[in-house]
């Protein structure tokens, strides 16, 4: 094996060893053993919320351990591939070296992707995520764009086998949604998806324009950590106004004959939260309270860091505040304006192929925090 390839393998070994240490491989095995014990409890599904959390974390942790173990196996096998290639002659030798080089390139990409997980060390990074999408400038196209984004994130979660719980969907009159709030129930979902926060811009030929003109639309994505019982977010009963109404579907159609939908208004802050996707008023109230607690936790966190005013100044779904651009016409390109990461296949991205953008965003955030 030539010195350059030896150096590449040694560098990958160093990176993977660091990843194994940070992820605590033995700790992962112990955690899996504990979760498997919980999952075997015959009464686990008596509490569906707990059951969902346990099974989701177990699946995630098992996948994480399998990923690291597989990377180590592949890295250990790589020198053997080059040794076997050296025993070949002529065209067979060239083919064997090319095969080993392809594995080296693939392994480097996979180790670097796994390394990104070690960068999720923020205070709330290991939490589940609460995602809110709001349509911005662009009329019916913006409402349709907001719904496309919602589908994109749900497809991403489904591809990773992460459960999604939709709390509220406010439909627009003609098409699309005004807003939606949903939770992604997976460890580190917040740390991963928080880089998606900001304004997303779509450029396309409008399907709602009789003259088929090009339209620019905006939608805003907000990502919060799901509140846990240890967060101590106390909300006095008198600080919250509760309004009930009938759930509505696309076009404003009523989908429920009872007043099961709930709107909570936090009077001191003016924060308004709605929930209409559960079957009963009580379930909707509980779900809405979870969302309100998450928003108040984020508000408290930002105030403690003296960032609230700066973030408000940066807010709004408009041209000047976009973080990613999705162009479907006159060319096809999705480009993150912070990281410069781009993909020429918008259809794949909108179908949930987001990992490249998420990894680039996490690395970008980590570099920013180090500066």
UniProtKB/Swiss-Prot annotation:
Classification via Gene3D superfamilies: 3.30.160.20, 3.30.70.1660, Release factor
Annotated InterPro entries: PCRF, Pep_chain_release_fac_I, Pep_chain_release_fac_I_sf, PrfB
Compartments, as annotated in UniProt: Cytoplasm
Keywords: Cytoplasm, Methylation, Protein biosynthesis
PTMs per UniProt: Methylated by PrmC. Methylation increases the termination efficiency of RF2.
Principal subcellular localization: cytoplasm
Key word Endoplasmic reticulum present: no
MF terms in GO: translation release factor activity, codon specific
A GO CC term assigned to this protein in UniProt: peptidoglycan-based cell wall
Cross-referenced Pfam families: PCRF, RF-1
Record-listed N5-methylglutamine modification sites: 253
Family label: Belongs to the prokaryotic/mitochondrial release factor family.
Any further remark recorded for this protein: Was identified as a high-confidence drug target.
Function: Peptide chain release factor 2 directs the termination of translation in response to the peptide chain termination codons UGA and UAA.
Name used for this protein in its record: Peptide chain release factor 2
Protein encoded by which gene: prfB
């Amino acid at each position: 094996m030539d010195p350059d390839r030896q150096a590449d393998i040694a560098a990958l070994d160093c990176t993977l060893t660091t990843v194994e240490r940070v992820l605590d491989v033995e700790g992962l095995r112990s955690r899996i053993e504990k979760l498997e014990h919980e999952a075997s409890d015959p009464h686990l599904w008596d509490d569906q919320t707990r059951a969902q959390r346990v099974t989701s974390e177990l699946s995630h942790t098992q996948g994480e351990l399998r990923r690291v173990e597989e990377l180590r196996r592949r890295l250990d096998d790589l020198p053997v591939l080059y040794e076997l290639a050296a025993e070949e002659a002529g065209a067979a030798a060239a083919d064997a070296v090319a095969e080993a080089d392809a594995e080296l390139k693939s392994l480097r990409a996979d180790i670097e992707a796994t390394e990104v997980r070690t960068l999720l060390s923020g205070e709330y990074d290991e939490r589940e995520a609460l995602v809110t999408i709001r349509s911005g400038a662009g009329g019916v196209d913006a409402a349709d764009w907001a719904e496309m984004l919602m589908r994109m994130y749900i497809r991403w979660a489904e591809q990773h086998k992460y459960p999604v719980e939709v709390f509220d969907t406010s439909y627009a009159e003609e098409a699309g949604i005004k807003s939606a709030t949903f939770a992604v129930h997976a460890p580190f979902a917040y740390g991963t998806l928080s880089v998606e926060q900001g304004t997303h811009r779509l450029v396309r030929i409008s399907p709602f324009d009789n003259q088929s003109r090009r339209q620019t639309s905006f939608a805003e994505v907000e990502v919060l950590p799901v509140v846990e019982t240890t967060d101590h977010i106390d909300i006095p009963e008198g600080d919250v106004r509760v309004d009930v109404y009938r759930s509505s579907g696309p076009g404003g159609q009523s989908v429920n004959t009872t007043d099961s939908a709930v709107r909570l208004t936090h009077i001191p802050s003016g924060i308004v939260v709605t929930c209409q996707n559960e079957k009963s008023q009580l379930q909707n109230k509980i779900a809405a309270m979870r969302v309100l607690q998450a928003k108040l936790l984020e508000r408290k966190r930002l105030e403690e860091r003296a960032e609230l005013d700066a973030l408000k100044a940066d807010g709004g779904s408009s041209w000047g505040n976009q973080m990613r651009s999705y162009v479907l016409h006159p060319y096809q390109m999705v480009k993150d304006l912070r990281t410069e990461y781009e993909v020429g296949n918008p259809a794949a991205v909108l179908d949930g192929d987001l990992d490249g953008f998420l990894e680039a965003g996490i690395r970008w955030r980590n570099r920013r925090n180090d500066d």
